[in-house]
């Protein structure tokens, strides 16, 4: 039974996913359906959480838009994701950066990894 499920999941997995972690700044390009038109919308922010669960893997991206914090959760293998670009690598010590929700301005910055 396990092999059967694994084979089905492998059909739906994406192969071209870049390797990123919490603290990285990324741009996620998503397919948006408006009426009968399809277009690509970009969402740029910092990855504050990543959940690795095979086909159900997801990540949360946070950005500040007009002074308000906006978070969006994406499934990594979703067919609605067109592309994921890494803008810069962040240097953090924690896997979940939920403490950024209460920070504003300079205290919400993350050091850049030079590796």
Curated annotation (Swiss-Prot):
Signal peptide: none annotated. SUPFAM superfamilies: Translation proteins SH3-like domain (SSF50104). Keywords: Ribonucleoprotein, Ribosomal protein. The keyword Hydrolase does not apply. Pfam families: Ribosomal_L19. GO terms for biological process: translation. The keyword Lipid metabolism does not apply. It comes from the Bacteria. One of its GO terms (molecular function) is structural constituent of ribosome. GO terms for cellular component: cytosolic large ribosomal subunit. Belongs to the bacterial ribosomal protein bL19 family. NCBIfam families: rplS_bact. This protein is located at the 30S-50S ribosomal subunit interface and may play a role in the structure and function of the aminoacyl-tRNA binding site. This is Large ribosomal subunit protein bL19. It comes from Buchnera aphidicola subsp. Cinara cedri (strain Cc).
């Amino acid at each position: 039974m396990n092999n059967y499920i694994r084979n089905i999941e492998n059909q739906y997995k994406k192969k071209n996913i870049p390797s990123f972690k919490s603290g990285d700044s990324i741009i996620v390009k998503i397919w948006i359906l408006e009426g009968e038109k399809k277009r690509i919308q970009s969402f740029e922010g910092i990855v504050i959480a990543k959940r690795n669960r095979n086909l159900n893997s997801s990540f949360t991206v946070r950005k500040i838009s007009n002074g308000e914090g906006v978070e969006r959760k994406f499934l990594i293998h979703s067919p609605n994701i067109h592309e994921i670009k890494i803008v810069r690598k962040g240097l953090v010590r924690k896997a979940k950066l939920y403490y950024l929700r209460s920070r504003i301005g300079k205290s919400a910055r993350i050091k850049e990894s030079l590796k």
